[in-house]
């Protein structure tokens, strides 16, 4: 799967109350901080899109993002297998990508995980 073509323009974030919305708020301000801390403190990887809590107003309906806990869909490539983003559940709109040279490497790695994600 190739995520390199994604851009912020492809991803629409708004309130769950608007039927045209593609995404709503995360569960709480505390959880928003947890998601952002995991993204910020990663030891490797390049953010392709997202990576910062949403600020300002929605282009769809003018909703003020400060009235909720909004984190955009975030895609990060080349994340180290030792990074917490691989080892822990983010429970948020974050996808981490890693290229494996040989298919067998994937299975060896997956079986070392605490969670099968």
Which residues are covered by each model-predicted region?
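Glycine-rich, small-residue loops and helix-cap segments
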Residues: 117
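NAD(P)-dependent aldehyde/semialdehyde dehydrogenase
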Residues: 1-114
